[in-house]
Every structure is written in C-alpha cells, then in structure tokens.
C-alpha cells in the first residue's frame, strides 16, 4: 500500500522540527497519522464568482475534520476575465491558468498533502486546478462556487433576463439611452457566482461532472441556493473516504487519472458539444489531458463534433435560458442522461461519488428516477434578491422540467440540431485546426465567404468596428493575438459584442488566432493554429483576400494560390513574424517568459520547455 504522503513530514525523530511547526498550526498528537487534506480555495474580492468563497473553505475543513482528516487551507489567485476584458489586463488571463496549476503543485508537494478539495469557480481557476489535480494524481474532489442568478429587468412592460454580455452590447448600441444602459448594467449581474450563461466558467464546472471529479449539481446549482451547501459538506466527507481507500486499501481507482480517463474526456467533450459550451473548454480539456498523459487531441474533438447533436441551448446562444434553467431541467445529469439514451457516452467508468457513471445516472437523471430527494434538489430556483452571500435563499419551482421535446434539455430525437454545438475547421488558413461555437451561429451563415479586413490587434479591431469600417459581408481578421503573439491569447468578447451592437452579428464573420469569451456568439472562429507569431498562414492574409468558411463540411480556406502564399511566406520570413503596425503594449518579464514557452492552441496553449 502507498504510504500517506504526509508522513514524510509527520513521522520520525528527524521530523521533530516539522512536527513543531505543524503543532503551531493547531495540530495535536492525535492528528499525526491522519490524512492531511489540502483545501485549495480561490477566494478573492475582485471576482463575483469568488467573493462568497471566503468562509466555504473552512466549511469544507470542518467537515474533513469531523470525518477524521486534518484540513489545511490555502488560496490561489483568480482573475476576472470580464473585468480584465478590453485592455491589457486580458494578457494575463490565460497565463494565470499555468500559475494556478503551478501554485497548487508547489503547495501540495512542498507540504506533502495527501489529497485535495478544489474550490474553484471562474474561467481559468477550474482549468488550472484541474491541470494540477491530474499532474499530482492524488485523491481530489472539485466543488465550485456555483453560477450566479440571471439578471432581470422590466423592459417594454415585460421582464427580460439579462447577463454580462447584454450590458456590453447595450453600451455600444446608440439605440439605448444612457439611462437604459445604466438599468441593464445594474441588473445584469445581481448575485455572487459565475456569470449566469453557458460561458467558460460554468462550462468547465459542468465538465467536472462529466469527468467524474465532482458531485452531481456542481455545474448548475446556484451559488445563492441553500442546496449548494450540501455539495461542500459532502465533499469534505467524501475526500477523507477517498484518501483512506487509496492509502489504506491500495485502491487506485479513486485517483484522478483512474477516473478522468480517455473515455471520461470523450464524455466531457461530448457534453460540451451537446450543450454548446464555451470554445475555451477545448483549450482547457486539451491542456488537462496532457497533464494526465492522455493522448486526447483536436482530431478526437473533430470526430466527436460530427456525431453529437445539440441538446441544450443556453445564453449566449439563447438569451432567455441560463444556468438556473438548466438546473431546473435536471442539470448536467439530465443532459448526460439524454446522451446516454442516444448511445453517445461511456458509462462503465467510475466517478468520485459512484461506482460507475451508469449507476449515477440511474439515481440522478430526473427522467429515470422517482427519488423525491433528487427532484427536490433540481427544483431549486433563483431567489431574485441581489446578494453576495452563499446559500442565502431556498426558493423552489413547483416541479422539475422533464420535457425533453420542448423543454430546456432535448432528447436526440428532438435535438436543436443533429450537428454539434462546437466544430473544428481545417484548411490552408488553419492547418492544425480552429474552433467555432456552432450553437451560437445563425443557420443563414453556416457557409460564408467574404473579404478579410485585417487588424493586427484586438484594440485596432474594436476601433475599426466602432468607427464603421466593417460592412455586411466582411470578415474581421484579428491576428498576433495567440498564446505567443499576444502574448496570452486574449478573449475577443468586445469585438463580437460590438459587431452585434452594430447589427452585424449575422452579417459578418470574425477569425482570430486569439480566443473568445464563453459569452461570444455569432460566426466567431478562434484558436487558428498555427498562430501568426509561429508562422501560421493567418499571418500571410492581406487586406481584401477572400476567405471561404464552410461549417457543415468543416472547412476554412484562404482563396490565394500556393505560389502566392509561398512568395508571401518568404517575405514574412525575412521581415520577421510580428505585427505590421506597432502596438502600444507593455509586455512584462512574466508575460515574456510565458510567451517563450507557450505552445499553440491546438495543444491547449500549454508550456513546453525549449529543446
């Protein structure tokens, strides 16, 4: 049996000094020999998705100790992508994922913790902790802070649901008065929690359920609802049980790499495609798979995207549906249940809470079970009161939405589309692939052809859109915004939001080697690989070049002959692969270090040491 890692610091005469320090943290004689569980929190007052986490780490810690473990809490950083958006702060967002993963590794290995409970929530925090968990491969349970309630505003004599993107779009739309914009701003983000749509944060928290590393309801139970407290309480007890099973019973099946297998990654990606998750999830799943030493690639995502239908449409794809509505329809277990019915999942694999996913679905899918407890759990409703306090309300819907024909979650037979919600496109513009969230693309522009309007940065693209330089039929092309070129692979939420505000959301396309917020919609194609900074064809496109986009056939093509491209490549090799116009960006040493090691989006933008 593997020895408890913590005994490296708690046992033996030579560890008297270390034990003295442990005692100074509150440990007593009877604690030495118990599993030491790291409570990996991410509380910060900068981020609404994390502002309520301050006391939740200690809630988990108390449950760990009541179950016979020793809990030690520490914090990671957490960047709010919405606040960092639209300025140089966004350069730090993706690199923060690596810092989070490293900080968890540093703390857990330096102090020889035996297991972890990861309390995450927003965009890069869940992926960073997931990467660390698979890197360390010690028992882990994920429990996130939960989604915020959707905003609501009275608009033209009716109540309209809102989220962060609505505020951005309205602010750039001259049809809205200052007073109307202010009303939307004040109502868009009413509570603590991750932004209310199927954006990156919620997408990733949902995927932890499919990977088998979190409890049912983790992705959809509102941050404000009292039911969410149960997830934290159960996580504290569960992690002690998992630690004992591994260290005392030699049960390797509880380890994250035994749970998050290739099949689990397929399940997670299948879920992502079916629910129209954020394109950022592709980046993060690829990165996590590499940490787990799993050969899960863009080719696998492409394969899955061709057979998985869209079973759930959530904001930004449908403005009236938010995470509270997904939960009301049975949450992630409800979507997984329909995917299983369609034969699209591997359900023989384990989870942290169940012997197999199949058994979990039998208990937790509201269309399969008559359990009063399960139906009550998924009837949790928004409270409708602005608050930053977790578990502060107990409102419920009268009954759960089990309509799989016209409800929030559809069966395969009644799918929104038999073609998946995410697609990988290939062609001479993206030899290693690029990603589009098809769930947010209008059917009328699934095939699109137009002239490229070149911008060497997100900033110049924003100015071009706001100043009326983009016309219907144009393709906005933003380059040198990839992992190396940015550096940091900025999100392009402002350009997509501004196109929408100008009435161009269904009349233009946007292509970039950067990435998109989970709040982006429209014909937005990102993660173009190779990126411009590493010699990708996107760096050879010139103003007015025609680009053909064919989503049904998964193709993207720059209509320039090979000989001309070869000439341009020779010229660019001589000039250097850098933006044609100077950018006023302060690139710190930290960002330069990230850029020096960053790989392409097709590899998850993970770091790779130079040969």
UniProtKB/Swiss-Prot annotation:
Binds 1 [2Fe-2S] cluster per subunit. This cluster acts as a Lewis acid cofactor. Pathway: Amino-acid biosynthesis; L-isoleucine biosynthesis; L-isoleucine from 2-oxobutanoate: step 3/4; Amino-acid biosynthesis; L-valine biosynthesis; L-valine from pyruvate: step 3/4. Keywords: 2Fe-2S, Amino-acid biosynthesis, Branched-chain amino acid biosynthesis, Iron, Iron-sulfur, Lyase, Magnesium, Metal-binding. GO terms for molecular function: 2 iron, 2 sulfur cluster binding; dihydroxy-acid dehydratase activity; magnesium ion binding. It catalyses: (2R)-2,3-dihydroxy-3-methylbutanoate = 3-methyl-2-oxobutanoate + H2O; (2R,3R)-2,3-dihydroxy-3-methylpentanoate = (S)-3-methyl-2-oxopentanoate + H2O. The modification N6-carboxylysine is found at residue 124. The active site is at 517 (proton acceptor). Its cofactor is [2Fe-2S] cluster; Mg(2+). GO terms for cellular component: cytosol. SUPFAM superfamilies: IlvD/EDD N-terminal domain-like, LeuD/IlvD-like. Mg(2+) binds at residues 81, 123-124, 491. Its EC number is 4.2.1.9. GO terms for biological process: isoleucine biosynthetic process; L-valine biosynthetic process. Belongs to the IlvD/Edd family. Functions in the biosynthesis of branched-chain amino acids. Catalyzes the dehydration of (2R,3R)-2,3-dihydroxy-3-methylpentanoate (2,3-dihydroxy-3-methylvalerate) into 2-oxo-3-methylpentanoate (2-oxo-3-methylvalerate) and of (2R)-2,3-dihydroxy-3-methylbutanoate (2,3-dihydroxyisovalerate) into 2-oxo-3-methylbutanoate (2-oxoisovalerate), the penultimate precursor to L-isoleucine and L-valine, respectively. Homodimer. This is Dihydroxy-acid dehydratase. It comes from Brucella melitensis biotype 1 (strain ATCC 23456 / CCUG 17765 / NCTC 10094 / 16M). The gene is ilvD.
